[in-house]
Regions:
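Outer-membrane beta-barrel proteins
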Residues: 31-37, 44, 93-95, 107, ...
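Outer-membrane beta-barrel translocator domains and adjoining extracellular loop/strand segments
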Residues: 1-6, 56-64, 70, 106, ...
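Gram-negative outer-membrane beta-barrel transporters
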Residues: 43-53, 69-166
């Protein structure tokens, strides 16, 4: 039983006859550099990676059962290749501040185009779904005072292709589509102060905001005919917190 539900119906997965195991071979090469500039400590990591997938699994919608549930068949595609570069860096002064960030550029392609909906006019697709070509993150901490600390953090997700099954009122039927999502930058801020109650007991009070720019999916499905799997981007809209 697939976890998604579309239009009030479930998605049931069956295995294709002769389904083979999926295998992968991965290679990577990296350089890790460290250097101090006085009190400032730095680190840079550069990595290249390459993964070849053989008989990669794909899900193809092949029809419906008597109860109106979607039947998805798990098949072997010809293969796929995932490759790219990863960059990570750190800079900081001990007991004062620290910044860490990373960024990845990658390509995720099937060897030959794959159809994910047999009864659809959509062309076969080489690009893997839900695999952005770029993504990154950063975290930083600044000790403003001996017991007062600020943290700034964030993640970046580039555009990606997402499958979407929606209700078409003109044809009175469910229709398959591919959506190119926007990119998202989800940034948050946290301030924390530590009170020393005794030599062995501390109390920390904190407050902040997550997803400061309210970078959030704007076209969520609603209603009984929604596609429960059509969700992408940050999990929460702007959120204030304290504790």
């Amino acid at each position: 039983l697939h976890v998604d539900a579309v239009g009030g119906a479930l998605k049931l997965i069956v295995l294709a006859p002769g389904l083979k195991p999926e295998y992968s071979n991965s290679f990577s090469l990296s350089a890790d550099l460290y250097h101090n500039f006085g009190r400032v400590q730095t680190n840079l990591l550069i990595e290249g990676f390459y993964t070849k997938l053989d008989d990669v699994f794909t899900l193809v919608q092949i029809g419906e059962d008597a109860d109106g549930n979607f039947i998805m068949e798990r098949r072997n595609a010809s293969g796929a290749t995932v490759k790219g570069f990863n960059f990570e860096g750190k800079i900081g002064i001990p007991n004062l501040f620290e910044l860490q960030l990373g960024y990845t550029l990658q390509s995720s392609l099937y060897d030959r185009p794959v159809e994910w909906a047999e009864n659809s006019d959509l062309p076969a697709q080489r690009k893997m779904f839900r695999t952005p070509d770029s993504y990154g993150y950063f975290t930083s901490t600044w000790n403003i005072a001996p017991r007062f600390r600020a943290s700034l953090f964030g993640t970046y997700t580039g555009t990606m292709l997402v499958q979407h099954t929606f209700y078409n009122a003109q044809t009175d039927s469910m229709q398959d589509a591919e959506t190119l999502t926007p990119d998202f930058f989800d940034m948050g801020l946290k301030l924390a102060y530590t009170f020393r109650l005794s030599t062995s007991v501390n109390l920390e009070l904190s407050a902040g905001v997550k997803n400061i720019f309210n970078s959030y999916q704007k076209d969520l499905d609603f209603g009984p005919l929604k596609d429960a799997g059509y969700v992408y981007g940050p999990a929460l809209p702007r959120l204030f917190f304290a504790g």
